[in-house]
Structure formats: C-alpha cells, structure tokens
Amino acid sequence: MAVDFPVKAIHGGTGKRQREKTRKNVLDFSASTNPFPPKVNWEPDLHLLEYYPDDYYTELKERIGSIFHRDITEICVGNGSIELIRVFCSVVFRNGISRNRFYLQSPTFGEYELSARLSAATPTIVPSDAGVYFLCNPNNPTGLLTKKEKTLALLDEMKYHKGILFCDEAFIELSDPSQSVAEISDPSLFVLRSLTKSFAVPGIRFGYGFGEPALIEKIETARSPWSVNAFAESYALEALGHMEELEGSRSAIERERHWLSSAISALGLRSYPSSVNYILVECGQDASSLCNELIRKDILVRDCTSFGLPTSIRIAVRTHEENIQLIEALAACVH
C-alpha cells in the first residue's frame, strides 16, 4: 500500500544558489551564522586525504569531552547536526527504544518532524504521549531561549513518562551557554550541538551529541562509516580550542540585535524578542512577495511560510554596515 512520503524540509542559507541564479552579489540574511566568529587559524592539509579518518574519532571525542566534562562513551559525532537527528530518530523509533510518537513546539526547525516521519513516527499534541520531545533551544525561528530550570523540568516529565528529551543547542553558544544542559548525564536526555552557527562554517559539516553510552553506541553503529571527513575533523579539533572567544561574539551580536530590532520597529513592523543572532519579524503582508522584493534589492531573508508563518520573515543579525543595508532595503519595500 502506498504511503505518503514526507516533504523535504526547507532551509535558509541559499545565498550561493541566488548568486548563481542572478549573477549578483546577494547579501544573505537567511543564514543565521555568527557574524563575528572567532579567528580559527586553520588551513586544509591535503595529506589528510591520503588516509581514512579514525571512524571512532577518539581524539575528537576526547577534545569535546574535556570541554563539556563528558566521557567519550557519551559522545557521538556526525556529518552536521542533521545527520545526527536522522540517525537518532532511526535508532529510537525503529528499534523500540521509545514509543513511535513525537512532540514538538510550533513553529520550530523542520528537520525534527521530517526525520521522525522518515522513521515511521507520528506527531502527538500531548507531550506525555510522546516517546521523544524535541526542544530547539534557542528555538528556530523565534529566538526564544528556554531557561535551564524549565529544560530540567521537561526532562523530569519525560523521565516520568518513560520518554526522551531531545535538546538541540545548535545556537546556544550565540545566546546564553549558561542555560545549556550539555554537561548533564541522564538516560532520558540527548543533547545536540554544532559548529556551523557559532563558527560560521556551514561548509564544514560537523555536529556532535551527548547521551547515555548505550544510546550513543547505537547511534555510532547506525551512522555511516567515516561520515566526518578528514577536513571537518581537522577543523573541529582546532575550532574547539576557541570556544571561550565566543563571549566576544555574544556581546557584539547582542548589541547589533538590539539596534536591528529598534530599526525594524521604527518601520512599523513587529519584531519578536530574541536571545540569539536572528529575529523573527511579522511583516503584515505575504512573506514570499516581500522576499522577492528584497531579492531585487540584493537582500536575501528567510521566508517563514514553511514554518507555518506566511506573513513572517526571519532576519539574521549581521555586521552593522550590513544591517544598515537591510533596513534601507526593507524601508523601501514596506513604505
């Protein structure tokens, strides 16, 4: 019997495609990467390509473990965080580890639902019925940060109902890392991290996660062999030594976010409170039409229609000069 196949999730970060399409230098506000990343002194070593990576990634896991005070048996790595979302869902939903129902906040990152559905799980509107509760923290696209106290309360609820709290902290280093639960070991908790956003390297696909050893062993078994390529591993080893420098990034982002929010409000648009390097904006008109107008002005923003928000856009915080260009283009489109 034919079964409806899930629809591919939509993402921002289409600047390269737009530049190739229009032959113009488009300013990409759709990709929410760090506009003030640490200076990582790294260059690709071509000799690394002569060997297979260590598929256990022992050195890499030891480096991660030393930062987050976790044993390497509690750490998994993957070709970007999305690979780990996919593998996690495959492991827990298809192997009887959890009930094949999931709960997620709305709006939120589309890959959770897609990955869960690909593993034959179905959504529920009742958190206590879920085998997995997906928490994006800070949330994408709203920028809302769930405080640690509330996250731990959610964890207690999932433990009580014999479920798993999946906490995606891809953006938390650009928000408030003191609210992270990455250092907490609990059989009912899986925490996801990524270098993409914090270090502004979407071309380096590297994600990592934390969970109980039994779950991590299954994820590492289900993951494709050598899925973290030699360049990604090499870059990650260097970048992880620069985590403390992200404090400067957070300060600069906060300053620019406040300026950008005020400038957006001055245009008569509603910007939602955000804790991170992007802002959700209610534009009071069809988002797709506004995005097309902005493209004609060489500005790319994230159309939030795919989030179920057809009159909203998501805007990344960039440098002050770039943010001024955005506001000027936005002003021309809404007035």
Task: Enumerate the predicted regions with their spans.
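PLP-dependent aminotransferase class I/II
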Residues: 55, 188-265, 269-272
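Phosphate-binding glycine-rich loop
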Residues: 57-101, 119
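Active-site phosphate-binding strand-loop segment of PLP-dependent enzymes
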Residues: 117-119, 124-175
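PLP-dependent enzyme catalytic core of the Aspartate aminotransferase-like
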Residues: 70, 149, 296-297, 306-335
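Short, conserved charged micro-motifs
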Residues: 40, 286-292, 322-325
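N-terminal "arm"/small-domain region of PLP-dependent enzymes with the aminotransferase-like
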Residues: 1-56, 63-66
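Conserved PLP-binding catalytic core of the aspartate aminotransferase-like
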Residues: 266-297
